[in-house]
């Protein structure tokens, strides 16, 4: 029991430090970045655990393609930004806070034309899978007829 006291002091100090950063101890502070392979695995696990099958397949494909594309990046600033955004994404998926969330306008404005094109392609893939899912469910109603 005596050995736990320094740990409790450190925990209390950490809580005070977080509250000084204006988040009042309610939300965790910035986490250390995970190494790429651990983050990659965490993302795939989060998809498996928290997403419906269709979204999981699309998400897994996208994560794999992005990590493959960034394998040869040498710029530390790009790597840190890449890993930070994917880690925030993992936290949102695990916390289920992504549902219905809109993209941050500031982030969209900072995107390159290529990134906006990728975002558009992703949106189209999601919509396409959604309409395919409607047809497979046997709706046969108006939604199936409109997509033809």
From Swiss-Prot:
Region (Disordered): 129-148
Transit peptide, from-to: 1-12
Gene Ontology CC entries for this record: mitochondrial intermembrane space; mitochondrial matrix
UniProt keyword annotation of Chaperone present: yes
InterPro entries in the cross-refs: SDHAF3/Sdh7
The entry's keywords: Chaperone, Gluconeogenesis, Mitochondrion, Transit peptide
Source organism, top-level taxon: Eukaryota
Cellular localization per UniProt: Mitochondrion matrix
Biological process (GO), any one: succinate metabolic process
Coarse class of the protein's main subcellular location: mitochondrion
Keyword Chaperone: yes
A Pfam family it matches: Complex1_LYR_2
Summary of the function given for this chain in its UniProt record: Plays an essential role in the assembly of succinate dehydrogenase (SDH), an enzyme complex (also referred to as respiratory complex II) that is a component of both the tricarboxylic acid (TCA) cycle and the mitochondrial electron transport chain, and which couples the oxidation of succinate to fumarate with the reduction of ubiquinone (coenzyme Q) to ubiquinol. Promotes maturation of the iron-sulfur protein subunit of the SDH catalytic dimer, protecting it from the deleterious effects of oxidants. May act together with SDHAF1.
Family: Belongs to the complex I LYR family. SDHAF3 subfamily.
Assembly notes: Interacts with the iron-sulfur protein subunit within the SDH catalytic dimer.
Protein name, UniProt field: Succinate dehydrogenase assembly factor 3, mitochondrial
Lineage of source species: Eukaryota, Fungi, Dikarya, Ascomycota, Pezizomycotina
Gene name for this UniProt entry: acu-17
